[in-house]
């Protein structure tokens, strides 16, 4: 059973840097106690969270809600019409940003100016590096979740996430997931696009490198509608692929233009566009893990955490040191792509560049940075980003002096039963058990507060998560 720390203070979260931190709206009871305004004049709809409200400040991360608006200050918190029974409340989000546009951000007013409602914008400052996972929904409508790093690029800032979703006819109840790596002591603004009405942010979960839940400990291919992984060594030999460094004990070289997947959901081609170092080294030894048997070697002319513009494939494959993998990914159905990566204790960035967005000019939709350092070279990081149907994305990694490992990618379209939030995936604490009551009288909500059997939503008992309905 996973060990967790439950803190019963009203605004407390999981305080140890070895745990995960849940960022969720305060409960309705707490809002009433603090005198927060009722939403639309009646607490049956929720309440308004005031600006400059510290949601969490523990050993791992500090999160403050402040939308920077004087006309629509604060954030509406909904407790009804949530499109789900998994969560019992949600931050309402929106901004002056457009769906899938990635316009530059120079100050908080750039994203809060002209907002239609009090919408949540978060300032997130990790004290320890790790990954931030968000669980969001906008019914059947399109929306983008943005994470802007205010510190990166020598203080000029850049997007590290611009994850777009449009579940459309697949169901308004689908809960999407976005995961991005954050750098210690950087400050990030998290906001959503304006879509005509509010986007729902149910919960954010921050997992530092030190958490036992950070690294991937097993890989279940059945959880994805399409898996992208290196061909087996036996297949490489059958096809006559060149042995890596002259001996198959090290792996092989995957040729350019290799189609890795062409399913009903997605097409994936490996092509680094290089004439000097064509193909991609596939390692079968020295890959820092026993969870996977092989890995794509990745690297490029891009730097760690720099987010330079990309105009063509040569921009990222020029002067690469080895045959490094670059992927062209074209979803046929919208969904989410999860990547499993590693670079030992060294720093690296996984980039996803949308070549189609911004009227064909392109933009980053992911720039997830990792530096596990002293936490262990075997840690496997995860990155999850929403992809738009019929867009083409280039996926590459920064150059770090040696190769980054991409063990596998998994894609789930909106139609997949494993899309987005899953009860057996991490939602901060432990496994979720649906409609099964715990045996003890002591029950907590996700904020560590004692509740009873009449409480609706996520509750905690003995380190496990349950849904009370």
Question: PLM features: residue spans?
Answer:
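Short beta-strand-plus-loop segments that form exposed binding edges in beta-rich domains
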Residues: 189-199, 394-403
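Short beta-strands within extracellular/lumenal beta-sheet-rich domains
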Residues: 88-89, 94-127, 174-178, 198-201, ...
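Residue-level detector of functionally pivotal "anchor" positions at catalytic/ligand-binding pockets or at interdomain
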Residues: 416-447
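Hydrophobic h-region of N-terminal signal peptides that target proteins for export
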Residues: 10-18
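Short, surface-exposed beta-strand/strand-loop-strand elements in extracellular ectodomains
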Residues: 140-157, 345-361
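Extended extracellular/luminal ectodomain segments enriched in beta-structured repeat modules
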Residues: 125-133, 185-186, 330-338, 390-392
């Amino acid at each position: 059973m996973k060990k967790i720390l439950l803190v019963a203070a009203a605004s407390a979260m999981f305080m140890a840097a070895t745990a995960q931190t849940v960022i969720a709206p305060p409960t309705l009871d707490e809002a009433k106690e603090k005198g927060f305004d009722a939403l639309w004049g009646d607490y049956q709809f929720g309440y308004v969270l005031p600006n400059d409200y510290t949601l969490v400040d523990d050993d791992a991360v500090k999160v403050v809600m402040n939308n920077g608006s004087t006309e629509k200050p604060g954030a509406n918190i909904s407790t009804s019409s949530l499109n789900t029974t998994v969560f019992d409340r949600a931050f309402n989000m929106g901004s002056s940003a457009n769906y899938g546009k990635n316009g530059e951000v120079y100050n908080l007013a750039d994203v809060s100016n002209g907002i239609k409602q009090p919408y949540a914008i978060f300032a997130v400052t990790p004290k320890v590096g790790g990954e931030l996972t968000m669980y969001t929904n906008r019914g059947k409508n399109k929306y983008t979740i943005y994470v802007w790093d205010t510190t990166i690029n020598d203080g000029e800032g850049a997007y590290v996430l611009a994850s777009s979703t449009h579940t459309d006819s697949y169901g308004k109840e689908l809960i999407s997931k976005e995961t991005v790596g954050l750098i210690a002591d950087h400050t990030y603004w998290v906001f959503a696009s304006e879509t005509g009405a509010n986007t729902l942010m149910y919960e954010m979960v921050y997992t530092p490198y030190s958490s036992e839940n950070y690294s991937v400990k097993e890989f279940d291919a059945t959880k994805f509608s399409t898996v992208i992984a290196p061909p087996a060594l036996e297949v490489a030999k059958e096809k006559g692929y060149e042995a890596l460094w002259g001996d198959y004990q090290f792996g092989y070289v995957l040729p350019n233009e290799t189609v890795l997947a062409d399913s009903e959901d997605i097409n994936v081609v490996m092509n680094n566009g290089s004439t000097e170092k064509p193909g991609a080294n596939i390692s079968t030894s020295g890959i820092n893990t026993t969870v996977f048997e092989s890995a794509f070697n990745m690297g490029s002319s891009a730097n760690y955490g720099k987010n330079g513009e990309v105009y063509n494939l040569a921009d990222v494959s020029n002067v690469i040191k080895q045959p490094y993998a670059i992927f062209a990914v074209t979803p046929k159905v919208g969904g989410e792509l999860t990547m499993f990566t590693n670079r030992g204790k060294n720093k690296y960035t996984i980039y996803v560049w949308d070549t189609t967005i911004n009227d064909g000019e392109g933009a980053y939709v992911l720039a997830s940075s990792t530096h596990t350092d002293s936490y262990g070279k075997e840690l496997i990081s995860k990155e999850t980003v929403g992809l738009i149907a019929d867009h083409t994305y280039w996926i590459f990694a920064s150059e770090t002096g040696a190769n980054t490992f991409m063990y596998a990618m998994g894609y789930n379209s909106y139609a997949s039963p494993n899309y987005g939030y899953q009860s057996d995936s991490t939602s901060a604490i432990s496994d979720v058990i649906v409609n099964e009551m715990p045996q003890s009288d002591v029950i907590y909500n996700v904020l560590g507060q004692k509740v009873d059997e009449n409480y609706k939503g996520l509750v905690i008992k003995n380190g496990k998560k349950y849904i009370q309905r």
